[in-house]
Curated annotation (Swiss-Prot):
Function: Site-specific tyrosine recombinase, which acts by catalyzing the cutting and rejoining of the recombining DNA molecules. The XerC-XerD complex is essential to convert dimers of the bacterial chromosome into monomers to permit their segregation at cell division. It also contributes to the segregational stability of plasmids.
Family, as annotated: Belongs to the 'phage' integrase family. XerD subfamily.
Protein name: Tyrosine recombinase XerD
Keywords carried by this UniProt record: Cell cycle, Cell division, Chromosome partition, Cytoplasm, DNA integration, DNA recombination, DNA-binding
Organism per entry: Staphylococcus saprophyticus subsp. saprophyticus (strain ATCC 15305 / DSM 20229 / NCIMB 8711 / NCTC 7292 / S-41)
Active site residues according to the UniProt entry: 146, 170, 241, 244, 267, 276 (o-(3'-phospho-dna)-tyrosine intermediate)
Subcellular location: Cytoplasm
Location of the Core-binding (CB) domain: 1-85
Length: 295
């Protein structure tokens, strides 16, 4: 099993172009799966059947796994067994009759427009790292891109004359996202004036750099967002995706086309984008309850 798992992980990295974070999640799920099978003395992939998978799911559930975690786990092992069958490592796929549990998708936390503006205005523009941070925050809110996508952007991906940025999303899929005048101005100053000061003697095409001239990490950007949110007196629970959620919700609240928002976010399934319409409706209900005299 260990060999097949490693071959599968190589496959999803090379053929599907998944990020290291996604591959890490797949690896953790498959390690749990393999550990359980070893405890059950199942030593060969063809000895796995529907009953052993259901026992594994029961074991994970009893140890606190949520319906969402189980759904992801099933998706991982289903993909793994399909690969094993296709590549002739196995004679059958035991996941065929396994159902994915349904779970309530949590509505994402969204910042109000005034909260976004407060967050954007927090970095100190007199400092080079402050100007860089303001530019990153502006770009995240202007495009709805993921933090993991932001750190991959290179200079040639940004076209300030035409007003767009190339974003490489999940599976290395490329999409073009338009840029507004405000973020274009910040990017122009950052690229021409701020980035050369950060670059120093380093040679890299990565757009956003730390104070040592190296590409910024996901963790560093997340830390920056949290610190600025505290300074802006934002009490909501933030995640690295909060500005992405806010971007989508604010567009839809102002009448943007759902499919256009789907395209900008890079969602392969429109049902994922539709989640933001529910956020908008919940905001409408909240306003109705607060302001209507007969609510």
């Amino acid at each position: 099993m260990d060999t097949i798992i490693e071959e599968y992980l190589k496959f999803i990295q090379l053929e599907k172009g998944l990020s290291s974070n996604t591959i890490g999640a797949y690896r953790r799920d498959l390690k749990k799966y393999n550990t359980f099978l070893e405890l059950q003395k199942i030593s060969h992939i063809d000895f796995i059947d529907r009953a052993s998978i259901q026992q594994c799911l029961g074991y994970l559930h009893d140890n606190g796994a949520s319906a969402k975690s189980l759904a992801r786990f099933i998706s991982t092992i289903r993909s793994f067994h399909q690969f094993a069958l296709r590549e002739k490592y196995a004679a059958k796929d035991p996941t065929v009759l396994i159902e994915t549990p349904k779970y309530d998708r949590k509505l994402p936390d969204v910042l109000e427009i005034n909260e976004v503006l407060a967050l954007l205005e927090t970095p100190n523009l007199a400092k080079i790292n402050g100007y860089r941070d303001r530019t990153m925050l502006e770009l995240l809110y202007a495009t709805g891109m993921r933090v993991s996508e932001l750190i991959q952007i290179e200079l040639e991906d940004v076209n300030l004359i035409m007003g767009f940025v190339k974003v490489f999303g999940k599976g290395n899929k490329e999409r073009i996202v338009p840029l507004g005048d405000t973020v274009i101005e910040y990017l122009k100053t950052y690229i021409e004036t701020i980035r050369p000061q950060l670059l120093k003697k380093t040679v890299t095409n990565t757009l956003f750099l730390n104070m040592h001239g190296k590409p910024l990490s996901r963790q560093a950007i997340w830390k920056m967002i949290k610190q600025n949110a505290i300074k802006a007196n934002i009490t909501k629970s933030l995640t690295p995706h909060t500005l992405r959620h806010s971007f989508a919700t604010h567009l839809l609240e102002n009448g943007a086309d759902l499919r256009a928002v789907q395209e900008m976010l890079g969602h392969s399934d429109i049902s994922t984008t539709q989640l933001y319409t529910h956020v908008s409706k919940s905001q409408i209900r909240k306003m109705y309850n607060e302001f209507h005299p007969r609510a």
